[in-house]
C-alpha cells in the first residue's frame, strides 16, 4: 500500500514514514481494504448509475467544493465534466501536476481553498496560490 501511495503521488516527499505506515496499517485489514475500494467497485460494476440516470438524479443544493488533481491516475478529469448539472452551487478547482492525493500533494493550497470556502469567501485558483 505504501509503495502504491508514494508511486502515484506527485510529491512523494510529502509522505512521511509515519503517514505511509498508517495507510499500510489501514490497508492491511481486509475489512478496511474492502471499504477503501467499494467506491471504485461500484463505478466499475455499474447498474446503479444507469438505473439512477433513468430515475433522475436529485440536484444537490448544498454548496460543494470539489478539489481535483489533474494527474489522478485513478480518475480522469473527464470524471468531473458535467458535475455542475447535478450540483447547483459547485466550486471546482483543478490542481495541475497533482495526483489523486490532493490534500497530501498540495496541502497548503488545498487548505487555503478549504478555508476560503468554509468562510464563504471566493475560493482561489491553484495557480494563484503557487509560491
Where are these regions (language model features)?
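Catalytic active-site module of serine/aspartate enzymes centered on a nucleophile-bearing elbow/loop
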Residues: 89-131
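Acidic catalytic loop of the alpha/beta-hydrolase fold
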Residues: 47, 71-75
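Short, flexible loop/turn segments with low-complexity composition
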Residues: 19, 38, 53-54, 123-131
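Residue-level signal for the nucleotide or nucleotide-sugar donor/cofactor binding architecture
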Residues: 28-31, 75, 105
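Short beta-strand/loop motif that positions the catalytic acidic residue
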Residues: 60, 66-68
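Short alpha-helix in the alpha/beta-hydrolase fold that links the catalytic acid
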Residues: 19, 52-53, 76-83
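Serine-hydrolase catalytic core
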Residues: 54-61
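Helix-rich cap/lid subdomain of alpha/beta-hydrolase
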Residues: 1-51
